[in-house]
Amino acid sequence: MSDFYADRLFNALERNEVAPGSLLVAAPDLASPEFSRSVILVIEHSHATTFGVNLASRSDLAVANVLPEWTELTAKPQALYIGGPLSQQAVVGLGVTKPGVDIESSTKFNKLANRLVHVDLRVTPDEVRDDLEGMRFFAGYAEWAPGQLNDEIEQGDWYVAPALPSDVLAPGRVDVWGDVMRRQPMPLPLYSTHPSDPSDN
């Protein structure tokens, strides 16, 4: 690897492995406006593909207008989030289980990390109501071809970090990207208030 990307912030830190349930935190200087200050929760990671949803992009559309039957389980703000640029007509459901729920043997959701699950939306809300603390719904997703994400991580575009249930169910007033940056190793907390447009700084 050349030294071309050596001065990127994330390249100075120890690299964590990507896995379902990990976060891809966008670099403060990420050139792509589509992913500026994004926090991607990885849902699947394999040799064939990696895909996930952006926890930090809320739309103005209410879940009640799209999936009214799921409104009661949706954490506030009860809005549909923009998961990514692909297949925005498809909805992805993420949930946080209540403590003590047996995730491993469930056919209603797939475990991502700790109490984070990918919910099968073919089930009814009544089938999972007793298992979940709350849910978040996403229109579309982000996806990487084989080797693409690894290249972007090596370039310093993304920092891989563990996810917390609070990242998925964060209240509307929370800056998810800044919140995640604040709990990472130094010097990342120093960049937690970095604006999406540096000219605003």
UniProtKB/Swiss-Prot annotation:
GO cellular component terms, semicolon-separated: cytosol
PANTHER family from the UniProt entry: UNCHARACTERIZED PROTEIN YQGE, UPF0301 PROTEIN YQGE
Annotated family: Belongs to the UPF0301 (AlgH) family.
Name by which UniProt lists this protein: UPF0301 protein CE2927
Organism: Corynebacterium efficiens (strain DSM 44549 / YS-314 / AJ 12310 / JCM 11189 / NBRC 100395)
